[in-house]
């Protein structure tokens, strides 16, 4: 039986929608998300180098393996619920290097792990202790270094904080999506004290939330809004029609423009970028629909732009490693 690998939103470049100002005339891809594109089948191993790393397992290194960061030499994991406080450090061969647990109520401890950012050059781990609106910084042996207190109005509980450069973290604040607040979602925060270094502003006319709520329950797509890609960053603002790349030199440029405008659709259909390769741009459309009784919805379509053929397709990706399992 063939097994299909679905490429869901992981990597790419951003959207500006219902915004004032003229769209750029070149150097970006235009995607009509209402079009019926021809089908295309791809083999994962034809465009990506696939590596499987078995993690060392023993009495100390037993983990449900929620991936937090991958560096040149290290892999950082926590357990999926993030509440037991365990942090696991493996090398790139899968050999366990260290288990850290600084869970507790003390000033140098965390009560929860929302996510972990790794600065491999400085040997620092940034623990998102989001219930206390702070990042706690440890070295790779688990020794406390400092606490970074951030603004309590930020909502980083989605766990999207990453190492941006030597001095800053890049973070995604999703509180505006929940409350329809007109505010920036992307920020650079200082690694030294957690202060705001830069607000990354993306233009849009009014806030459009990808979330739906009913009776105190909320549901939203699980696509990613902030991803690193070849030294630049993908910033996905659901209220916009243009997908941008944000570079280390703080320059920002359009990469993909979606049509029709997001503000013209009911229900809205969002475009989330995914993996970028030298030849292919993977994307996913997500429709804002959810059945709260059946707990199903947000129907998706996987797309790929083939640069060699200069054409967009609806795609299915097969993983040869799984086909004969």
Question: What kind of feature is each model-predicted range?
Answer:
Residues 59, 101-109, 150-157, 203-207, ...:
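Short coil/turn segments at the loop-to-beta-strand junctions that recur within blades
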Residues 323-325:
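Conserved small/polar residues in nucleotide/adenosyl-binding loops
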Residues 23-52:
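Blade/loop signatures of beta-propeller domains
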Residues 51-85:
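Beta-strand-rich domains and repeat architectures in extracellular enzymes and scaffolds
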Residues 58-60, 95-121:
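Blade-loop segments of beta-propeller domains
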Residues 15-17:
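C-terminal motif of bacterial Sec signal peptides marking the signal peptidase cleavage site
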Residues 66-69, 116-120, 160-165, 214-230, ...:
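Structural signature of eukaryotic scaffold interfaces centered on beta-propeller domains
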Residues 131-136, 140-183, 199-207:
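Asp-box/WD-like beta-propeller blade repeats and closely related beta-sheet repeat scaffolds
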């Amino acid at each position: 039986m063939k097994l299909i690998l679905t490429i869901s939103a992981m990597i790419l470049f951003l959207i500006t929608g219902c915004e004032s100002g003229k769209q750029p005339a070149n150097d970006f891809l235009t995607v009509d998300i209402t079009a019926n594109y021809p089908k295309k089948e791809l083999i994962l191993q034809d465009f990506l180098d696939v590596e499987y790393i078995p993690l060392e397992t023993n009495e100390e290194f037993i983990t449900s393996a929620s991936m937090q960061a991958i560096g040149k030499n290290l892999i950082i994991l926590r357990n999926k619920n993030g509440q037991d406080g365990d942090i696991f450090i493996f090398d790139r061969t899968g050999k366990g290097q260290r288990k850290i647990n600084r869970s507790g109520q003390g000033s140098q401890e965390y009560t929860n792990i929302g996510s972990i950012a790794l600065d491999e050059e400085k040997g620092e781990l940034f623990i998102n202790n989001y219930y206390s609106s702070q990042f706690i910084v440890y070295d790779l042996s688990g020794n406390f270094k400092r606490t970074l207190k951030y603004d309590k109005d930020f909502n980083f509980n989605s766990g999207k904080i990453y190492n941006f450069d030597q001095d800053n973290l890049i973070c995604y604040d999703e509180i505006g999506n929940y409350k329809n607040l007109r505010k920036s979602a992307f920020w650079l925060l200082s690694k030294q004290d957690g202060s705001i270094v830069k607000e990354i502003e993306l233009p849009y006319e009014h806030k459009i939330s990808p979330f739906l709520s009913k009776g105190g329950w909320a549901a939203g797509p699980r696509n990613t809004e902030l991803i690193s890609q070849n030294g630049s960053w993908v910033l996905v603002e659901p209220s916009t029609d243009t997908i941008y790349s944000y570079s280390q030199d703080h320059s920002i440029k359009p990469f993909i423009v979606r049509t029709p405008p997001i503000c013209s659709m009911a229900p809205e259909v969002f475009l989330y970028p995914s993996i970028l390769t030298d030849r292919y741009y993977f994307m996913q459309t997500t429709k804002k629909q959810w059945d709260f009784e059946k707990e199903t919805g947000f129907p998706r379509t996987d797309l790929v732009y083939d640069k060699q053929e200069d054409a967009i397709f609806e795609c299915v990706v097969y993983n040869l490693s799984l086909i004969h399992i």
